Regions:
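A detector of single, family-specific signature residues
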Residues: 1-427
Length: 427
């Protein structure tokens, strides 16, 4: 997987036909060039279905026969999800598929005509020229268990977003119709609070039934004792509520629908997380990853889902760059800019690593010692957040070795980064 630009350029020979494809939802556009940038044939438009893809291959094959080319390299932008089917079709036919960064396409499209114009004729050439110059990457399309795991993680992210929207709707509803509710219940997702919202959500309903009926409703589903003081506090809050009273009938219908959606999403989320755990445990090295104190199943599964098969990587810095944790600096002349992380890469991977490092710091002694060392050392002490990012990169290296070499986690090796003055002086 590790190719520098020279290696990428060397893969393109005089026998290679480079095709740049501008991907769209229904109609793709393509142009063909050789390794010097000379165009062959006419631009083609083809549909995003089997007939269109076969037509594309026939067009490319005709050009290759006429120009004495032996290899086809197809470059494209990863536009949304529209490129996936076409890329799979080409890979099934044993043709090389590469991707160019949409940001690079945007920046380089003015080279030929000094114009920011974007159209279906111009973009395929821009893409092909980037490929010709070795400015491409080979797509990391997961297969087998890694593909299943990534899709499962995608589903979990979708459900989590939907659940957050539902939670916000409940919070909005309470702010409008019963703003005092949160003074009685610290969390509306608690059992007693949910029963209240289902059975008697409005102040008028609460005042109409009294404390005994409220307690009886709670005790039906809650085994532990629920205090009468809480019921009296709820009645008092309802009696003093400043919530909106107009349209209250449909407000009750609204909260009922919202809570039904909430319960459905919670159930679906538990189900998909159980499936994620099942899939993750099939990945070689999963148990070794979980042996690190503080590493949870879900965050570890997200790491694997984003990175894919570890054998595709030659160095942990590739994963660090994939996560957007590689360091960048903006300096010129005597001006020395501030060093920051690039944040270019897989957002979910970067987020998972950062979320993972917090419980690790709370539970793992080796990481705690490293964190203390990085933030208190005499030379170049780091701020706490900077140290956490450094530890995220350290965690990447630990995972890389565990998965690549099939070894167990060794906390003592972690501490080799700490420079101990007493040891140096003794030497």
């Amino acid at each position: 997987m590790k190719y520098n630009q020279n290696t990428k350029i060397m893969q393109i020979t005089e026998k290679t036909l480079i095709v740049g494809v501008d991907i769209a939802k229904e109609i793709h556009h393509a142009r063909a060039f050789d390794f010097r940038g000379i165009e062959y044939g006419k631009r083609i438009e083809f549909s995003n279905d089997i007939d269109g893809m076969k037509r594309f291959l026939k067009w490319a094959a005709d050009i290759m026969n006429k120009s004495n080319k032996e290899h086809l390299m197809v470059g494209m932008e990863p536009t949304g999800h529209y490129w996936l089917c076409f890329a799979q079709f080409l890979r099934d036919k044993k043709h090389k598929v590469v991707l160019v960064n949409p940001f690079h396409v945007k920046r380089s499209k003015e080279f030929d005509d000094n114009s920011p114009t974007k159209n279906d004729r111009k973009d395929p050439k821009t893409i092909a020229m980037l490929v010709k110059d070795g400015r491409y990457v080979e797509p990391n399309i997961p297969e087998g268990i890694y593909s299943e795991l990534r899709i499962a993680v995608d589903i979990r992210e979708m459900l989590t977003k939907d659940l957050n929207k539902i939670k916000n709707r409940v919070a909005r509803w309470l702010d409008i119709y019963f703003p005092e509710f949160n003074k009685v219940f610290a969390d509306w997702e608690g059992k007693a609070a949910l029963i209240t919202l289902k059975e008697f959500p409005t102040p008028a309903k609460i005042l109409g039934i009294g404390a005994e009926e409220i307690l009886a409703a709670w005790k039906k589903e809650i085994n532990r004792a629920v205090g009468a003081k809480r019921a009296l506090k709820l009645i008092e809050a309802a009696s003093q509520s400043v919530g909106k009273r107009d349209g209250i009938e449909m407000a009750e219908v609204e909260i009922k629908i919202i809570l039904e959606q909430y319960e459905m999403l919670v159930k679906q989320l538990k189900k998909i997380e159980s499936k994620i755990e099942e899939l993750f445990m099939q990945v070689p090295g999963a148990n070794e990853m979980l042996s690190i104190k503080g590493v949870g199943v879900i965050t570890a599964a997200i790491f694997i889902a984003e990175v894919g098969d570890i054998t595709r990587y030659e160095h942990p810095k590739q994963i660090q760059k994939l996560a957007g944790y590689n360091l960048v600096e903006n300096s010129s002349g005597q001006h020395k800019g501030q060093t920051t992380i690039s944040k270019r890469g897989r957002r979910r991977l970067r987020s998972a690593l950062y979320k993972m490092i917090m419980p690790i710091l709370a539970n793992n002694k080796e990481f705690q010692e490293l964190h203390k060392y990085y933030t208190t050392r005499k030379e170049n002490p780091l701020k706490k957040k900077q140290s956490m990012i450094v530890l995220c990169c350290k965690l990447i290296r630990v995972f890389f070795v565990i998965l690549k070499k099939g070894v167990k986690y060794n906390g003592n090796k972690m501490l080799r980064d700490i420079k101990r003055p007493e040891i140096r002086n003794a030497a």
